[in-house]
Every structure is written in C-alpha cells, then in structure tokens.
C-alpha cells in the first residue's frame, strides 16, 4: 500500500521546497497594493496584484522600521522577500522584508511629500493669494510655443478681447530641464511687468506633467509679485503648481477666460460707470448749490444792512400797529362819547323846553318844581326855548292827583 501523508506533513514538505528554492528564498516582486490592512500587532497584511494574478503578502512589525512611507491602496511597489507556505491554511504567501515605491508610486510619494512640506510652510495659505487684475493690458504665458495649449489661449483671448496683448515665453514643459525653463519664464515675465501670468500646458501622464510638481517651480510661483493662473493638463490633473498658484484653471482654455475679460462686458460696464459718475457729479453739484444758497442766506442774515433793514421794518410795523391801535381807541372813545352825549341830550332841560316845557327858578336860581317852594310875592324866572320870562307868584293852588 502507498504511503499516506497527513495535511500537515504535506504542507511542511511544500514549505521545505520553498525554503530550499534559491529564487523563492530571496525574490523581488513588482505589483499594485490592494486589500492593505494594518493589524493591531503592528503587522501589515496586503495583496500584491498585476493584470492577471495576485499574491497574499505580509510585512511583520519588525521590518516596518525600514519602511520610509505609508503603504496604501493603489501604490505600485517592489517588494523584497521570500515565498513560503502558511502551514495552518496551506496557502503560500510572500513574506516581505523590504518595500520600495516603483515608477508611478514613487512619483506619487514624492508628490505627497512635497505637497505636505509646502503646505506646512504656508505656501498654500489663501492669505497669500493675489487677486487677478480685473482689466489687464498684458497677459504673459509660460508654455510650449507649439501645441494645443498656446493656440487655445490665443484664440479665446482674441475672441474675448483683441486689445489685450499676449506675451509668450516659450518654455520646455516636460522632460529634463523643463522646470528650469518654467522658472525662467515666470521671472522674465515678472521683470517685463505683465498684469497676469498663465503657467501651464496640455494634458498628459503624471510623468509628462511632472515639471509642474517640482519644488523650484512652486517657489517661483509663490515668490512672483504678479498674479499667476495655473492651467496644467485637464480638469482631473492636479499638480503642486495648482495648490501654490493664485488661481487654478482646469484647462488652458479656462485660464484664458479667467485672465481676459470680455470686451462687451467691459463696454457695458463703462456705460454703467459713466452713468453712475454723471449721477454722482450731479448730486454733488446739487448738494453744493444748496449748501451755497444756505451759506449765502446765512451771510445775508448776518449783514449789518440786513439787520438795519429788519429793524427799520420792525419800527414801521410797530408804528403802523400803534397808529392802528390809537385809531381804534379814538373810535372807541368817540363812540362812548356819542353815547354819553345822547344820554345828556335825553336828560337836558333845554331839549324839554323845545317840546313845550318851561324851566322855573326862584330869585336864587333854585328850581321851583313844587308849590311848596314858592309863596305869593316871590319873583320867579321862567325859562322857555327862546328866552326868559320874569314873573311874580300871585298865589299857589294845590292839585289833587
């Protein structure tokens, strides 16, 4: 009968095969990280995969001290380790001892490190962002002299406002030395005194766009005294230049729209500003005229001639009022006098004489209005309407009533 082996024996046998294999005992493997998990023990468990296959991997805590970056999903890495069997599960896996970023992964890591460094230095702080010139006369462009980017910028700028001058600094935008020419372009346009600078290029891979992730370019943008618009690649492409620039445009075409205002809008604004200015000036003139008239009136009131005229008029008015009151008083008194005269007339003996009555008085002038006030022999005077009658009392006779 054939020999029968236990599962453990088979797993152990296979493990020994891996251990004795020179290639598998020390092997470099390249792939993309997925299913990355950090265990509480300090170990890192992850899967290394490519287009058609995958392998389980583990980096024990003792080897993590040599890992210069944080292992994350999607990173392209090269792993040094050994392949062996995990006997409990009967599965083989890569036991990693060293992990390095590879290709794109290394670029992404450099990107994140520089991004973190510049952010900590404050180069991305919004307080450092400069405001674009609203009505630029000159726009500088740092990009390649050939390609779609410069043509898009020229076409859109001329359509929006043909009076804005475009100044191109032909820079190398990818490959060796590209970052230096971009920095030189920024400094040259700053020295020329343009109003706004567009720094960018068309789309491409992360390697193609890498010049705009260089630290020297980021610092040149930050140190520039002129507002800079970053316009690198397409909307989904993000570079360090986008973070440090004063304004990010998703494309070079969008950058031209941001930098160059439409002339129709400018003309409309000018008409509005002219109308507002005229209205403002007219309001100020009206206010000034009103204030002048007010001051003139105040000066007139403070004039000695005006004061004398006012006093003279006051005197005339007072005189007229006094005369009016005097006339009213005279008329009133005359009216009272007329009343008294009428009363006196009504009581006057002379008026009664005209009615046929007479006035009798004795020799002493006392009125004789009773028989008791005279006696026979007394001389009397009888006053009538046209004179006096001298008479003597002959006798008196009482009349019964």
Curated annotation (Swiss-Prot):
Q: What does this protein do?
A: Bidirectionally degrades single-stranded DNA into large acid-insoluble oligonucleotides, which are then degraded further into small acid-soluble oligonucleotides.
Task: Report which residue ranges the record marks as coiled coil.
Answer: none
EC top class, as a word: hydrolase
Quote the catalytic activity from the record: Exonucleolytic cleavage in either 5'- to 3'- or 3'- to 5'-direction to yield nucleoside 5'-phosphates
Q: Which of UniProt's keywords are assigned here?
A: Cytoplasm, Exonuclease, Hydrolase, Nuclease
The record's family statement is: Belongs to the XseA family.
* An example Gene Ontology molecular-function term: exodeoxyribonuclease VII activity
Among PANTHER family, the record links this protein to: EXODEOXYRIBONUCLEASE 7 LARGE SUBUNIT
Give the record's GO biological process terms: DNA catabolic process
Q: Which HAMAP family does this UniProt record tie to the protein?
A: Exonuc_7_L (MF_00378)
Give the source's domain of life in one word.
Bacteria
What binding partners and quaternary form does the record give? Heterooligomer composed of large and small subunits.
Task: List the GO cellular component terms.
Answer: cytoplasm; exodeoxyribonuclease VII complex
Q: What is its EC number?
A: 3.1.11.6
Subcellular localization: Cytoplasm
What is this protein identified as?
Answer: Exodeoxyribonuclease 7 large subunit
User: Which InterPro entries does the record associate with it?
Assistant: Exonuc_VII_L, Exonuc_VII_lsu_C, OB-fold_nuc-bd_dom
């Amino acid at each position: 009968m054939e020999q029968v082996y236990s599962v453990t024996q088979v797993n152990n046998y296979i493990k020994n095969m891996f251990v004795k294999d020179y290639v598998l005992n020390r092997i470099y493997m390249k792939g993309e990280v997925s299913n990355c998990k950090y265990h509480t023990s300090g170990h890192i468990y992850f899967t290394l995969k490519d287009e058609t296959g995958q392998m389980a991997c583990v980096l024990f805590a003792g080897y993590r001290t040599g890992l210069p970056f944080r292992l994350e999903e999607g990173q392209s890495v090269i792993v040094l380790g050994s392949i062996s069997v995990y006997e409990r599960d009967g599965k083989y896996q890569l036991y990693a001892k060293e992990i390095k970023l590879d290709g794109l992964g290394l670029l992404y890591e450099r990107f994140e490190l520089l991004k973190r460094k510049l952010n900590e230095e404050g180069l991305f702080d919004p307080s450092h962002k400069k405001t674009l010139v609203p009505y630029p006369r000159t726009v500088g462009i740092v990009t390649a002299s050939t390609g779609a980017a410069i043509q898009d910028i020229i076409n859109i700028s001329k359509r929006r406002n043909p009076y804005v001058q475009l100044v191109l600094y032909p820079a190398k935008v990818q490959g060796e030395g590209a970052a230096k020419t971009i920095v030189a372009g920024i400094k040259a346009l700053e020295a020329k005194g343009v109003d706004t600078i567009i720094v960018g290029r068309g789309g491409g891979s992360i390697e193609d766009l890498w010049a705009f992730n260089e630290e020297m370019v980021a610092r040149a943008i930050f140190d520039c005294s002129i507002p800079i618009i970053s316009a690198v690649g397409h909307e989904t492409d993000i570079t360090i230049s986008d973070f440090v620039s004063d304004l990010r445009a998703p494309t070079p075409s969008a950058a031209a729209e941001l930098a160059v205002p439409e002339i129709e809008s400018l003309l409309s604004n000018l008409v509005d500003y002219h109308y507002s200015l005229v209205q403002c000036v007219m309001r100020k003139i009206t206010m000034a005229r009103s204030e002048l008239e007010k001051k003139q009136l105040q000066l007139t009131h403070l004039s000695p001639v005006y004061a004398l005229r006012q006093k003279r008029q006051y005197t005339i008015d007072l005189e007229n009022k006094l005369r009016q009151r005097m006339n009213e008083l005279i008329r009133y008194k005359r009216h009272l006098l007329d009343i008294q005269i009428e009363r006196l007339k009504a009581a006057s003996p002379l008026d009664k004489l005209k009615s046929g009555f007479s006035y009798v008085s004795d020799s002493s002038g006392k009125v004789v209005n009773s028989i008791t006030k005279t006696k026979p022999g007394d001389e009397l005077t009888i006053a009538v309407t046209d004179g006096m009658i001298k008479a003597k009392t002959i006798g008196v006779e009482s009349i019964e009533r």
